[in-house]
Amino acid sequence: MYKTAETVSPGHPDKIADLISDYVLTEALSNNSKSRVAVETFLTGTTYGGLVVVGGEISDIAKIDDKGIEKIVKDALAKTIKTSFEDFQLDSLKIQNELTPQSEEIRSAVEDDEDLGAGDQGIMVGYATNETESFMPPTFDMSRNIQMALWEIQNNDEKLDLDSKVQVTTGGEETKVVISTQHKKDIDIDELRINLEDMITKYVDGKFQFDLNPSGSFVKGGPAGDTGLTGRKIVVDAYGPTVPVGGGAFSGKDPSKVDR
């Protein structure tokens, strides 16, 4: 039976959105460990140089103002984007803080004098297998390992940018590996292909087919190339597509949100 799993880099626009939401959460809990946080981030290229919107609910005790949000966003972008484009410019994009106070109904349901309650009902799925050292499903584990190695290469190679995806298919005579990685215009694709093939051999046993950037050139990436939104990569964040997910995202949520 064929099995396919995909992973994405921290420079993928959806994962950048996740990172910003988690940075807001971390700052809120650092300011006050009792902060209640449910943050969503949206980022996109625009005709005026890019937009990042941070919204959701947050306790007043978290004490994060507009300047705090701006710093958080810029810190996250500095770790996940190398290159500015006309429609997403790191030095001039618009950052919009739309955080509002947490609902009093949710607050009263979560907290009382004796117990800590859940902020919502939900479905949570746990999984482990002894087929891999990570206890993850084998195909997903393979994709994830290749992605982590690719991320290191992306950070250390000046000809590569930071948006990428890795897809692995197993179950046939040969494993199929597809990598899409953002790059500079003047990159030598043939040389990159050789380097990535060498890397893949460390994580794939036996023969494999390898496709690099099957859609062609991939210069414009990150939020300049595609919109990013918190919570759109929940399968990647969990155990891959062979294991059910409950449906809730992890990022930007304090521990009273049971899916976190």
Predicted regions and their residues:
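N-terminal, positively charged regions that mediate nucleic acid binding
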Residues: 1-38, 140
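Conserved mixed alpha/beta catalytic, RNA-binding, or beta-rich assembly cores of soluble enzyme
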Residues: 60, 220, 227-260
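Cofactor-binding beta-sheet edge motifs in enzyme active sites
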Residues: 3-5, 9, 26, 41-47, ...
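Glycine-rich, mobile lid/loop segments that gate access to catalytic sites or pores
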Residues: 4, 8, 43-51, 71-223
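ATP/Mg2+-dependent ligation/transfer catalytic cores
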Residues: 8, 12-17, 29-31, 57-66, ...
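A generic structural motif
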Residues: 12, 57-64, 129-134, 182-187, ...
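Long, well-ordered hydrophobic secondary-structure segments characteristic of membrane-embedded
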Residues: 28-59
